[in-house]
């Protein structure tokens, strides 16, 4: 959305010499606006790198977040610098043609950002309402189509003024004014803000209702399934697990409940994070989309230039604060941000490649005298742990209290055929899983050793994702 100045509204038909620049004001605005632009650019780049460098963030939901960051990055890197120069100088210094192009790119990026939030709200509604069916409903192909629709619709809304849908431009090329043609103002306000806002609010109201209902149901079920053991028991499903009689049905029911609990907890937390993003979006953009139509349809009620500049930059501010919201609201993004800032991205990807597909053997006395490798499973390698109640008939993993690093002592559980041990760094949640494996030759086929695909996730003590 393009800045409007008072002299623009006068519709001057001649080019006036630019007024002298107030140096102190220019320096102050340059520092503030320049810092805001740099923060927005670096923050959105950080979001993109965090998703790109962490396998567990390679999901359709996070691709939507990357799309939002791309739109915000384009806005902060291609539009805001010229807006800041316009604000500092007090006049447009780049000519009429570039003014029109700049205005179109401005509307394109802002609309794409807003519609991206709309797509995210729909995605979160599906994730919370249908957590188990979500992967089949929201596929990568459908996600790509949704993102294409976002950018096509944004392009349609933004290019109207380039084809003449605007009021006559002033002859003074130092004036780059907002398009106040009433028809276009109504069209762009509805398409860029009010329709997406209505969808967002409806989706999050439904998310809230579903989350409250599901939370009550899952909490009541969790109370009946809690174990008396103080140890955290995590199990990994594997095929061809023997079971007897009616225990199969009971195990399936408990497994379904536990998987549903974890998936719902994960979707609920993502919905909370993105709900904060949407709340900030409404606070930032609503004033602008109230002021703009009022000024277009009712010129007598047009706000002052100072008020307009405030709401104008408040809308831009939204594209700079989303990178703050993610780490503050999500441990997942906080860890990803920290890894990128510490330049651990490449090392984590390489470690992940070695960890995935590793064949784990249960600890046994036969392995005691052999060389062992400690396999580091990095958090965020793209896998999932399920916390499931006892007697499920599935492969069991027990995680014990923290042990000093470098300790060679290995705790061997009683049931060596069904579980193996690991160490965790934190008592409250899983940060790093170090599993005991063997570098010895692969056992013979008649040796009953399960080959397990490793699945990891960060879990709280109650089973929720952290």
UniProtKB/Swiss-Prot annotation:
Output the Pfam families linked to this UniProt entry.
Answer: 7tm_1
Q: Which residues lie on this side of the membrane: Extracellular?
A: 1-27, 89-99, 168-181, 298-305
**Its Gene Ontology biological processes?**
adenylate cyclase-activating adrenergic receptor signaling pathway; adrenergic receptor signaling pathway; adult heart development; cell growth involved in cardiac muscle cell development; cell-cell signaling; MAPK cascade; negative regulation of autophagy; negative regulation of heart rate involved in baroreceptor response to increased systemic arterial blood pressure
Q: Which InterPro entries match?
A: ADR_fam, ADRA1A_rcpt, GPCR_Rhodpsn, GPCR_Rhodpsn_7TM
Task: List the expressing tissues.
Answer: Abundant in heart, brain, aorta, vena cava, vas deferens, submaxillary gland, lung, and kidney. Found at lower levels in prostate, parotid gland and skeletal muscle.
CDD domains in the record = 7tmA_alpha1A_AR
Q: Kindly list the GO molecular function terms attached to this UniProt entry.
A: alpha1-adrenergic receptor activity; protein heterodimerization activity
Membrane topology, Cytoplasmic segments = 52-64, 123-143, 206-273, 330-466
**Mind telling me which residue stretches traverse the membrane in this protein?**
28-51, 65-88, 100-122, 144-167, 182-205, 274-297, 306-329
The residues that carry sugar chains are: 7, 13, 22
Cellular component (GO) terms are: caveola; cytoplasm; dopaminergic synapse; GABA-ergic synapse; glutamatergic synapse; membrane; nuclear membrane; nucleus
Q: How does it sit in the membrane?
A: Multi-pass membrane protein
Q: Which residues carry this modification: Phosphoserine?
A: 215
Q: Which cysteines are joined by disulfide bonds?
A: 99-176
Q: Where in the cell is it found?
A: Nucleus membrane; Cell membrane; Cytoplasm; Membrane, Caveola
Enumerate the SMART domains for this protein. Answer: 7TM_GPCR_Srsx
State the function annotated in the UniProt record. Answer: This alpha-adrenergic receptor mediates its action by association with G proteins that activate a phosphatidylinositol-calcium second messenger system. Its effect is mediated by G(q) and G(11) proteins. Nuclear ADRA1A-ADRA1B heterooligomers regulate phenylephrine (PE)-stimulated ERK signaling in cardiac myocytes.
Q: What is this protein called?
A: Alpha-1A adrenergic receptor
Question: Which gene is this protein's source?
Answer: Adra1a
């Amino acid at each position: 959305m393009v800045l409007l100045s008072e002299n623009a509204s006068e519709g001057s038909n001649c080019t006036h010499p630019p007024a002298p620049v107030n140096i102190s004001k220019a320096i102050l605005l340059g520092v503030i606006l320049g810092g805001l632009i740099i923060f927005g650019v670096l923050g959105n780049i950080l979001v993109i790198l965090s998703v790109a460098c962490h396998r567990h963030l390679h999901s359709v939901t996070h691709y939507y977040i990357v799309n939002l960051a791309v739109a915000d990055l384009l806005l902060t890197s291609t539009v805001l610098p010229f807006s800041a120069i316009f604000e500092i100088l007090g006049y447009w210094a780049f000519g009429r043609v570039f003014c029109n192009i700049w205005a179109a790119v401005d509307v394109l990026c802002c609309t794409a950002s807003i519609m991206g939030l709309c797509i995210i709200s729909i995605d979160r509604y599906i994730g919370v309402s249908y957590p188990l069916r979500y992967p089949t409903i929201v596929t990568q192909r459908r996600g790509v189509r949704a993102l294409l629709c976002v950018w096509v619709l944004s392009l349609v809304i933004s290019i109207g003024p380039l084809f003449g849908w605007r009021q006559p431009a002033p002859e003074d090329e130092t004036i780059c004014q907002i398009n106040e043609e009433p028809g276009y103002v109504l069209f762009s306000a509805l398409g860029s803000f009010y329709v997406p806002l209505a969808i967002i609010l409806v989706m999050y109201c439904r998310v809230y209702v579903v989350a409250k209902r599901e939370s009550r149901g899952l909490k009541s079920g969790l109370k009946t399934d809690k174990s008396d053991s103080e140890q955290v028991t995590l199990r990994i499903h594997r095929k061809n697990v023997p079971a007897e009689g009616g225990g199969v049905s009971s195990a399936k029911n408990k497994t379904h409940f536990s998987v549903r609990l974890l998936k719902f907890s994960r979707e609920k937390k993502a919905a909370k994070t993105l709900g904060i993003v949407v709340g900030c979006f409404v606070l930032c953009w609503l004033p602008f989309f109230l002021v703009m139509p009022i000024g277009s349809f009712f010129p007598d009620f047009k706000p002052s230039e100072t008020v307009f500049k405030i709401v104008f930059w408040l809308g831009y501010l939204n594209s700079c604060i989303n990178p703050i919201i993610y780490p503050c609201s999500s441990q997942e993004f906080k860890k990803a941000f920290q890894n990128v800032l510490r330049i651990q991205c490449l090392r984590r990807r390489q470690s992940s490649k070695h960890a995935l597909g590793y064949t784990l053997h249960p600890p046994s006395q036969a392995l005691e005298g052999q060389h062992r490798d400690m396999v580091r499973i990095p958090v965020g390698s793209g896998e999932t742990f399920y916390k499931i109640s006892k007697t499920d008939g599935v492969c069991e993993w027990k995680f014990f209290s923290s042990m000093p690093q470098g300790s060679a002592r290995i705790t061997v559980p009683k049931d060596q055929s069904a579980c193996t041990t690991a160490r965790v760094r934190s008592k409250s949640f899983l940060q790093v899983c170090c599993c005991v494996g063997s570098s010895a030759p692969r056992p013979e086929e008649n040796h009953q050793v399960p080959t397990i695909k490793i699945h990891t996730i960060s879990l709280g003590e109650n089973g929720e994702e952290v």
